[in-house]
């Protein structure tokens, strides 16, 4: 029989509730960003070091050590700024992950944990346009699954494109996407043609036994 696609995407729960939750996350970010600018932090947020650190966190130091990919996006780690909001995201996430793991017997016996919750803002012209995978360096070999939740859809472009699956996932508000972290799911974020794209993303790591 045909196996289910290793890329799971869909809504978990009622659409109205999901949209409210997504709006809450975006609102928190916008408030945080406004405060940061007011505190004269804008230069630090957009510094070369901030971009280099962000690229390293996404791709691994050894894969793109120079940080010369011309990124145009900004991220914050929600778990360090708003624990209650992160807990709500994780609660939403868990239902989708349970469904995903139920489709693949090997994952049922694999101890997984997720702690990072990265909020990412991608403006017009932005995106991560280099094909990559999420377990591309020695330091990230424990990554087992990748997850991402699209927080809005009022922009053009910005699909997540998987090269070997020949699939583009169209962003829709509240959609959770889960996929394996290995090279079989090499992907990129397509150019945001207009508007601003917001997502939260992270990884499930295999716990040592």
For each of these PLM feature ranges, what is it?
Residues 1-13, 18:
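Single conserved hydrophobic/aromatic residue that forms the stacking wall/gate
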């Amino acid at each position: 029989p045909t196996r289910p696609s290793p890329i799971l995407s869909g809504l978990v729960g009622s659409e109205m509730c999901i949209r409210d939750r997504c709006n809450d996350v975006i609102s928190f970010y916008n408030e945080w960003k406004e405060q940061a600018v007011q505190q004269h932090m804008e230069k630090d947020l957009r510094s070369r070091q901030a971009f280099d650190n962000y690229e390293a966190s996404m791709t691994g130091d050894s894969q793109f050590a120079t940080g010369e990919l011309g990124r145009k996006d900004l991220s914050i780690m929600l778990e360090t700024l708003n624990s209650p909001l992160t807990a709500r995201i994780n609660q939403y996430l868990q239902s989708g992950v349970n469904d995903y793991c139920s489709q693949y017997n090997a994952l049922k016996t694999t101890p997984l944990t997720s702690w990072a919750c990265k909020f990412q803002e991608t403006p017009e012209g932005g995106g991560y346009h280099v094909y990559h995978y999420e377990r591309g360096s020695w330091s990230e070999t424990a990554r087992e699954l990748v997850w991402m939740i699209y927080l809005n859809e009022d922009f053009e472009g910005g699909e997540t494109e998987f090269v070997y699956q020949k699939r583009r996932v169209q962003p829709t508000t509240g959609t959770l996407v889960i996929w394996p972290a290995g090279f079989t799911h090499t992907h990129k974020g397509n150019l945001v043609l207009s508007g601003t794209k917001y997502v939260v993303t992270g990884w499930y790591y295999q716990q040592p036994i």
